[in-house]
Amino acid sequence: MRNRCHGKVPSRRLFQDPPLRPEQAARLSAAFLRDVTETMRAAAASVPIAGYAAYAPAGTEEALTPHLAPGTSLILADGSVPAPAGVEGFGRCLLHAVRALFDRGHTAACVLSSDTPTLPTATLVTAATLLLTGSERRAVIGACDDGGYYFLGMRRPHAGLFADIAWSTDTVAAQTRDRAAALGLDLVELPLWYDIDDAASLDRLVQETSGSNAAPWTRHAIGALGWPVPMRSSCAA
């Protein structure tokens, strides 16, 4: 298991809607990462998985490590390795990480968004179980309600799953489903979830973590930032 390429704040949109200062967005990003890697660690108590945090650029390991759950390994995913035609941008980072995991001898690999701090451990356990009990044609996707995906797992490093994808748009999950169908994969869907990349999703996060035990590191960061903050009611999902 791995988080997606780390090193930037969750989304450029968080600087604008609502307006966050760079240090606020960075603090949230670090808290998200800790909560997600803690979720991976909790899931590992039920299924035989290993947690990784993918990062870029090289040389940032020391800055990243304090924000990871104990036992989380690092894996470089800067997209610098050769990739087939059509695999560009963020897709190169994802493919780089997936290939590296298989090169380490794992029988399955996945990419997991670090912008999903409230993702239930049970969902990750289900995803790993589906992957580990499926055939070599098995793939698993967890779509976000904004059209992206928070999870993509596979039994082989299928570069085609990352080819010709319009990254950072609301068609990413749909295009990935199309690529899986073209490759003849057995694609299984996880429950719909959400990631934090705009005012509406941040407002949802603040409300969801208020008075709950979910995402403790994120909850602490929200409290330290003096939130809940007023969000724009017009930014409904």
Predicted stretch roles:
Residues 1-14:
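N-terminal nucleotide-binding beta1-loop-alpha1 segment
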Residues 27-47:
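A short, N-terminal amphipathic alpha-helix
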Residues 48-57:
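Short beta-strand/loop segment that forms part of the nucleotide-sugar
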Residues 63-108:
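Short phosphate-binding loop-to-helix
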Residues 110-112:
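Short aromatic-hydrophobic micro-motifs that form the base-stacking/packing surface
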Residues 119-146:
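Conserved donor-nucleotide/metal-binding helix-loop-beta segment in metal-dependent transferases, i.e.
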Residues 158-179:
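Short, glycine-/small-residue-rich phosphate/pyrophosphate-handling segment
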Residues 175-237:
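Conserved alpha/beta core of the MobA/IspD/sugar-nucleotide pyrophosphorylase nucleotidyltransferase superfamily
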